[in-house]
Amino acid sequence: VDAKTLKLKKTIQNAGQWVTGLMWSEQTQRIYVANGGGEILILDPKRNRIEKRWKPLGDKPALLLNLAEDSATGRLFVTDNSKAKTTLVLDIHTGEIIKQLDVGDSLAVKFNAKRNELYITQRESGKLLSLDATTYAVKQTWDLPPNPNSLLLSADGQTLYVSVKQPSSREKEATAPDDVIRIAL
C-alpha cells in the first residue's frame, strides 16, 4: 500500500494460511510475517516478494501469531497459541531455533532492550509474563483477567501498556468495554 495515497500497489501471493503477524526489522531491512500454517515468511519490501520461508516447528501443528526482535543479538521471538503453546526464540538470519520457551499459551510478545526483558501475554490463562531475556526465567507474573491481548512499550522502556479484552464470541457479545492497563516497570 502506498503510504501517501493509501492505494494498493501490489498483492503478495502465497503468503500461507491466515497471515497473523507482521514485523519490520531495522537490522535486516526485511518484513517478517507469521501465519497460521506455522510459517515465518521473510519479505523484501523493495521488491515486494517473499525471499524465504521458515517452518521452525516442522510438521508439528503451529499457529504462529506475533513477533518481536532483539536487534542487538539477532533474536526473533515468535508466539504460538496452537497445540504447541510456546514462544520460539529464533536466529533472525537463519530461522534456526535457539530456544523454545514452554511458558504456556502465548499471544503477544514484546522485547524491552532497556531492561533486557521479554513480555508475553497469555490470553487464555489471563496472565502477563515478564522474562529475563538472557536466561528466559520468569521474573514476574501479573494476573490480568479475562484476556490480556496486545502490548505497547513506552519509548523509555519503563512503562508497558496491555490491552485486556472482554470475553466475546459470535454467539455472545462482550458485556463490558475492553481495558488498557498501564504497568510501571
Which positions does each model-derived feature cover?
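Predominantly soluble domains enriched in secretory-pathway, periplasmic, or organellar proteins
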Residues: 1-185
